[in-house]
């Protein structure tokens, strides 16, 4: 009898497997490229393609707000980071608007030396260039630093009581 063969178990129990998949999908959409073993990448690929398709459904102009909210909530079941969800719906889905699948690709690398396991790279097919990604991250960090600095100066001016002479 062939039982327990519908899901790739990845040598983990259900909770650990789900956490692994969610974290790797989040990393894929955040960095647009991840490196891992072939078995994990094949599982992650199918989940990622489904999430991109779900995000693309929100690009339809006459879609009801309830359906848009439902799509976003379904994606947020897998991706817990709100910034990554926003990136998926506003940036990644628009890049793949004209494609009907094949949003990701798995590239094979040389087997890992320590345990000889098959390693590969999973990446989005229409990736932004590395220089553009680094520039965007730097701008984001600078904006966050500026906001923190303004917050600190506001706290200092509020917390220092005026001295009596």
From Swiss-Prot:
NCBIfam families: L17. Part of the 50S ribosomal subunit. Contacts protein L32. GO terms for biological process: translation. Residues 138-165 are annotated as: Disordered. Belongs to the bacterial ribosomal protein bL17 family. Keywords: Ribonucleoprotein, Ribosomal protein. HAMAP family: Ribosomal_bL17. InterPro entries: Ribosomal_bL17, Ribosomal_bL17_CS, Ribosomal_bL17_sf. Residues 138-158 have a biased composition (Basic and acidic residues). Pfam families: Ribosomal_L17. It comes from the Bacteria. This is Large ribosomal subunit protein bL17. The keyword Acetylation does not apply. One of its GO terms (molecular function) is structural constituent of ribosome. One of its GO terms (cellular component) is cytosolic large ribosomal subunit. SUPFAM superfamilies: Prokaryotic ribosomal protein L17. It comes from Leptospira borgpetersenii serovar Hardjo-bovis (strain JB197).
């Amino acid at each position: 009898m062939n039982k327990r063969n519908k899901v790739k178990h990845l040598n983990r129990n259900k909770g650990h497997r789900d956490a692994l998949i969610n974290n790797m999908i989040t990393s894929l959409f955040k960095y647009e490229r991840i490196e891992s073993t072939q078995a994990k990448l094949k599982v992650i690929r199918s989940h990622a393609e489904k999430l991109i398709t779900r995000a693309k459904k929100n690009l339809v102009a006459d879609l009801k707000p309830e359906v848009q909210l439902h799509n976003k909530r379904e994606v947020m079941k897998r991706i817990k980071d709100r910034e990554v969800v926003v990136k998926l719906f506003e940036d990644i889905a628009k890049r793949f608007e004209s494609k009907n699948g094949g949003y990701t690709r798995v590239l094979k690398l040389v087997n890992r030396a320590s345990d000889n396991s098959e390693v590969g790279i999973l990446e989005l097919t229409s990736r932004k260039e590395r220089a553009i990604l680094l520039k965007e991250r730097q701008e984001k960090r600078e904006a966050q630093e500026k906001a923190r600095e303004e917050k600190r100066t506001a706290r200092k001016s509020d917390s220092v009581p005026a001295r009596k002479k």
